[in-house]
Amino acid sequence: MSKSTSVSTILYLRQRLQGLKIYETSDLIQHINTFDELVGEQVSVDVKIEEKTKDMILLCSLSPLLTTLTCSMVKVAASLRFPNERWLEVITKEPRAFVYHNFLALFFKICKTNEECDHLISLAKPSMARSKVRNALTGLGEESSSRTSSGTFIRSGHDKIVKEIEKRISEFTFIPQENGETLQVINYEVGQKFEPHFDGFQRIATVLMYLSDVDKGGETVFPEAKGIKSKKGVSVRPKKGDALLFWSMRPDGSRDPSSKHGKRHCLSLNLF
């Protein structure tokens, strides 16, 4: 599943960044006239999740991350609605990519039943159709051997659960709900794939929510990303309930070439 947003939200993001307050590290921000004026030396920031969760996510998401800034955040305690701990993991700085573990609510931990994941799958199944790619010349969608999955869209605000998820995505990304696209559910059967590509130029960020588990394959791959120890290429393994956020544009509005991504073949089971 994925959800993307338009470039028109850049001004909103800058406005939110200007209002950012991290009291324990007031010397961290020297100038916030533009995104690329954040910090000049390495700083590690720890905050109390109850008070500054949103500020921390905003700082980690919007800072250029081409500097030596390092972000860290304490885990969110388990609760009845979210019996597993929820926490944010920085995957790579180029592109800016993060995984929010246990993003979707798990109601019955013992039975491994994830109501939000299963609910979205049940809404999507009746209307699934072959996925398409946009023709660069005509602008129209067409089937392609580069994308062999199937998918469908879920109307915004379809029901209470969909509304809650859309609200959570907005809070996670600090992007207004009205600037996001409708939820799109994608299904990859065994052997299906989506070859590396760039998201449309009208998008600045994408959130991929994993609705199911697979034993082998199905990773989201960033072939041009800068990984650990300068190794080229990063992959994210799907885990039911997790959400992957990555930014297709740099803070200055230019396209990030390292945001090129694809989906590996599923070698066992189906992936939503």
Swiss-Prot record:
The chain crosses the membrane at residues 56-80. Binds 1 Fe(2+) ion per subunit. Gene3D superfamilies: q2cbj1_9rhob like domain. It catalyses: L-prolyl-[collagen] + 2-oxoglutarate + O2 = trans-4-hydroxy-L-prolyl-[collagen] + succinate + CO2. Residues 179-272 form the Fe2OG dioxygenase domain. The keyword Ribosomal protein does not apply. It comes from the Eukaryota. Pfam families: 2OG-FeII_Oxy_3 (PF13640), Retrotran_gag_2 (PF14223). It is found in: Endoplasmic reticulum membrane. This is Probable prolyl 4-hydroxylase 11. It comes from Arabidopsis thaliana (Mouse-ear cress).
